[in-house]
Amino acid sequence: MTTSSNRQSSDALYQDALTHIVGGVNSPSRSFKAVGGGAPVYMERGEGAYFYDVDGNRYIDYLAAYGPIITGHAHPHIHEALMNASSKGLLYGTPHRLEVEFAKKLKQAIPSMDKVRFTNSGTEAVMTTVRVARAYTGRELVVKFSGCYHGHSDLMLIAAGSGPATLGSPDSAGVTKATAKEVITVPFNDVEAYREMMKEWGDQVACVLVEPIVGNFGIVEPKPGFLQAVNDITHEHGALVIYDEVITAFRFTYGSAQQVYGIEPDMTALGKIIGGGLPIGAYGGKAEIMETVAPLGPAYQAGTMAGNPASMATGIACLEVLEQPGVYEKLDALGAKLEAGIREAAEKHDVTITLNRLKGALTVYFTDEIVTDYEGAEKSDGEKFGRFFKLMLENGVNLAPSKYEAWFLTTEHTEQDIEETIEAVNRSFAQL
């Protein structure tokens, strides 16, 4: 097992970064604030299932860039596609062949999308679906589930209040109270709370945003019947169902969580995996709804870099890798092996955990309670997770620096990687 106690170059880079970059990082999630502080690890390169930092340490990577790198780092097929595209020009500002090819490929994989439009990020995709839903329905209120993250647009940075349903309050400075009043939050997996909320507000609701499988307070599956009930109740009140599949699309099957549960939304927002590692977003839905978007309709959305050739090329290449036989079966088998090893280690070292896994993604919560909603995830011991995170790093395993994030497997992880990871878990649990 590789250990990585020497990180002097990372420490020095962090001190330099603090002078030039806000907080030393370009996204708060990269900070180690949630795991006890200190300098984050600065990576030099990624290769397959591994990261190599600026001090030469190797890590088995389960961050996978918070999910997008399902094919591992620097996958040869995706790299080749990027090189070919870049040799012809990275940005056109005009229509081109690759955006048509990629749109067709996404539609084939996710049949609920009659029409598709590309954006630059998942945040943009979600933000635009809400705008389109409001334009289509003529209504203003938006519903989301407590603890579910839908990007950093003002409307989505709303925290859950107390009680079964509440008008939101701002979760970030700079988000106005007026904006917060446009969002209603409801506990995930609670059909009755959703039903009661819609009885009160349904005639004003434009849409509900749903992570069909939660990925932002760990991996949490919907309870049986929950997604169908949300669809039925929403449509009874004339509102639209939007699936935020930025994390879930192509993570658990070739396609989306819609195929896993057999339920179709009105619109779908995509990101992360579909770019093969490059910035991307997309949204799609029923033709009559999507025709609300300019230039056909009054809902405006645009982007200089939307549909750029590089992202289209890597996106197509990524899906070509994922559609090969056996990909998701391998991810599931490795996930099962990792889960069994973590559970055995927890029992051996008398460490209390709850583990949620779906195929190639899992979350370890330091709590004895079953986690089916955000309230349950909050009970995970953050201080203990912080110590576990740093111990795993010392033992050559890279995780997300937050108790709420998932471990993501890639097509490049091997059984040997899983065995090394289980060894690291045992060493770390022994020191908690």
UniProtKB/Swiss-Prot annotation:
E.C. no: 5.4.3.8
Cofactor needs: pyridoxal 5'-phosphate
Cysteines paired by S-S bonds: none
Reactions accelerated catalytically: (S)-4-amino-5-oxopentanoate = 5-aminolevulinate
GO annotation (BP), single: protoporphyrinogen IX biosynthetic process
One Gene Ontology cellular component annotation held by this UniProt entry: cytoplasm
Modified residues (N6-(pyridoxal phosphate)lysine): 272
Any GO MF annotation of the entry: transaminase activity
Compartment(s) where it occurs, according to its Swiss-Prot or TrEMBL record: Cytoplasm
Cited CDD domains: OAT_like
InterPro entries: 4pyrrol_synth_GluAld_NH2Trfase, Aminotrans_3, PyrdxlP-dep_Trfase, PyrdxlP-dep_Trfase_major, PyrdxlP-dep_Trfase_small
Broad class of where this protein is predominantly found: cytoplasm
Family: Belongs to the class-III pyridoxal-phosphate-dependent aminotransferase family. HemL subfamily.
Subunit-structure text: Homodimer.
Identification of the protein by name: Glutamate-1-semialdehyde 2,1-aminomutase 1
Organism: Exiguobacterium sp. (strain ATCC BAA-1283 / AT1b)
